[in-house]
Each structure stands twice: as C-alpha cells, then as structure tokens.
Amino acid sequence: MDPVLVLVLTLSCLLLLSLWRQNSGRGKLPPGPTPFPIIGNILQIDIKNISKSFNYFSKVYGPVFTLYFGSKPTVVVHGYEAVKEALDDLGEEFSGRGSFQIFERINNDLGVIFSNGTKWKELRRFSIMTLRSFGMGKRSIEDRIQEEASCLVEELRKANGSLCDPTFILSCAPSNVICSVIFHNRFDYKDEKFLNLMERLNENFKILNSPWMQVYNALPTLINYLPGSHNKVIKNFTEIKSYILGRVKEHQETLDMDNPRDFIDCFLIKMEQEKHNPHSEFTIESLMATVTDIFVAGTETTNITLRYGLLLLLKHTEVTAKVQAEIDHVIGRHRSPCMQDRTRMPYTDAMVHEIQRYIDLIPNNVPHAATCNVRFRSYFIPKGTELVTSLTSVLHDDKEFPNPEVFDPGHFLDENGNFKKSDYFMPFSIGKRMCVGEALARTELFLILTTILQNFNLKSLVDTKDIDTTPVANTFGRVPPSYQLYFIPR
C-alpha cells in the first residue's frame, strides 16, 4: 500500500478516535475547542501569553472550559467567582496537584509543592508547624528580615551610587532569611557558592517560562528523548540538590536531638522518631525535596517581585516620591521600618499590594487536580482531571481594579486615602494549596522595599518614559526585563 495513503488513513483514524473521545465526554466535562489528535489544543493557544488565550476562550465557552494539553483534558477556571468556588468552596475536592512533568523528574512527586495525598498533607502540616516554630509570622522572623535588610543597604552603599544590576543582590536578602531557617546560617553577599546557587535559580526560572517548557509539559514522553533546555533545568536542580545534600550530611553529623537548630534538624529528628514505621513519609528523599521546595520558592519568587517592584518604582517616580514622603513622616531616617508601621502607612501598603497585583507573578497558578469525582457547577469532573485557575483573570479584573493594566496604588485605597482590602487579591493563591510562605513573603516585601526607599533614591539609566515594564516571559511565571539603576544615598 502507498505509504502516503497509510499515513492519511492513520491520521484520519486518530482524528476520529479523538473526536469520539471528545464527544463521549462532552456531556461531563465543560465545553471547549475541539482538540487535534496527540497534540490537543496546543496550536490554538498562544504559548507566549497563555492568559490572553484563556481570556479569549472564556468569552467563547464561559468561565469554565476544557482544553487538551497533549492528549489529557485540563479544566480551566476563569474569573473571581469560578476561581473562588473551585479553590475555596471545593478546596478539598481540588486539593490535588496537577502534573508538572519537569518537577516530577526532579523531585519524584516528593516535597510540599508537587506531592499528593497523605504524603503532601503530612509534609505540609510538618513544614508549617516547623516554620512557625522558627518565627514564621512572629516577631522573631521580622527581626531577621530587618537585619537582612540592613545588610542589603550596607551592600548597596558599597556601590557608591554607581550603576547596579539588581538581579542577584536582591535575591541574596530573601534567600538569606530562608537559609537562616533551614540551614541555620546566612551567606556573605560575595560568597561564590551562594551566588552560584542564585544564578542557577535565576536561570531555571527563565527556562521554566520559555515556550519550550510548555511543550515539554504537554508532550514529555516525546521530548524526554530530545536535546533542549529542559536538560539544563535538571542539571541546575541537580547542582542545587547536591549542595543541600552536603548541608544535610553536616547536620546529621552534628545533630542534637534535644536542641534542633533549624528546619533540617527538626526533619531529621522526625525521621528518627518514625524510623520503625515502614510507611513513614519522613525519609531522606522527602527531606531533600522539601528543603529544595522551600529554598527555591522562598528565594526566587520574592526576588522577582522585589526586582519587578523596583523597576515599576523607577518608572513611576510620583509613586516613589509619595512612598518616601510617608516613610519620612512615619518612620524617619534613624530607625529601621517594622511591621507595626504598616497600619500607619496606607499608601506604602497599597504600593506593595499593587506591585504584586500588577506583576501577576504566577498567572495561571500551579496546576491542581481533582482528588475525587467532582460535581462543579453543571459539569462532572472525573477524579485525576487537572485544573488550571487563572489568577490573571482575578488580579486584573477590570470591575474590581479599574484600568487593571495601569500600575496604580489607588487600586488599594478608598476615597479617604485609607488602605482598602480586596477579596480579589490572591497572588499567593487561596484554599488548601495556598503558598506556605505567604506571611513571610508579605513581611519581606514590606520591610525590604521600605528600607531601600528610606535609604536611597532610585535613578534610572534611561528616561523614565522609555522604561519598559513588559515581562520578557509570560508563561508559567512573569519575568521582568533586565535593567540597571543607580541607588543614590539619601
């Protein structure tokens, strides 16, 4: 038989099979565009701006629709009401973690971010309790952040007002706060091993936001055998985990069961307590994955928010001037900012919230999954079905935030200039899977940004009207463009 005819017949059969599967499930899953065989709806999605495609599909199919990434159906939830219903009202039913193929290869479904079931619940509960015992959400962690913010200021002063690339110096501060909790030490800002870890994290976040990685996650079986940037991500994570393993071994050699120094010690003690339980989730592999999760998430997300925030403040000089005036009035120049100041600084508080809302760091959240068969609105979502929630559709809702594409702290101020809370503010997600480190991140952002603006004026290398704040990546997360600036002592 002619090879071309065989190919045509094969493709036709695949198309018919796909249509049959799609139609047979259409009475259950939400509506959506018809997928192609094997590749699904990938060609119908703008991989460089997935949120834009989701917005289009929501207008065609409604706030809940189905897309196929490869051969697997994914339910997409768009808009505040639908997102809240899925993650909050049905939080337990949708508390599963959807697949993120690159991390499955790296962490083997361990840790607190990408694990599932009993494993996830036990590791998350332990992590939250342990982080709290080391000051998370308490005055003690605030003291550490203040101390680190002061170290950052001293490091910036050493530049003597010369041109500075903030990429790595800003990552050092939040990373050192996390390191003090999990490793019981901080690093000098010039430490080569430390800077190498920061570079690996920065490089990975950029690669994870590339269109190639979205294709990889949709077609992992095929892509696994091809060269590509996914191999660089795995190599970088191997290097990071190798460093962490070295620190774990040091802790094992010096462990005092009665006096835990940090998160690693607490985990090792828990392992010892459960050593006779063959089903224990507390293993050396789980320790490695959990520490990696906390270290990576606690460093890079806050770093990017700080970096993006300074870029926005560099461009919007009128906002910066108002914040500095409030800092001078409430705090002055001779003491460090503290969290108690926040209630008397509504404009600064609004500025920090607006940075997070505007940059929309993780536009479509980390994927969730149904832990059981779920009746969601008028649809039936089978157990294991992946769920993507559009945080962009909430953070950039034009009814809650008029002109959402404009950076404006007024989005969080009432008519009297008082800070105004919004239920639509969910950069850390909501529900059972919301970010473990939300309280820490909020504290870091307020204290570090106010400390920088208390001590420095920001000066741009180019005219402020020429500053581009458009993200250079806009898939899994949003990455600001590279830039340089002058930190001029006040």
UniProtKB/Swiss-Prot annotation:
Its cofactor is heme. It is found in: Endoplasmic reticulum membrane; Microsome membrane. It is a peripheral membrane protein. Heme binds at C435. Highest level in colon. Low levels in liver and small intestine. Induction: P450 can be induced to high levels in liver and other tissues by various foreign compounds, including drugs, pesticides, and carcinogens. One of its GO terms (molecular function) is retinoic acid 4-hydroxylase activity. It is an enzyme of class 1 (oxidoreductase). Belongs to the cytochrome P450 family. This is Cytochrome P450 2C55. It comes from Mus musculus. The gene is Cyp2c55.
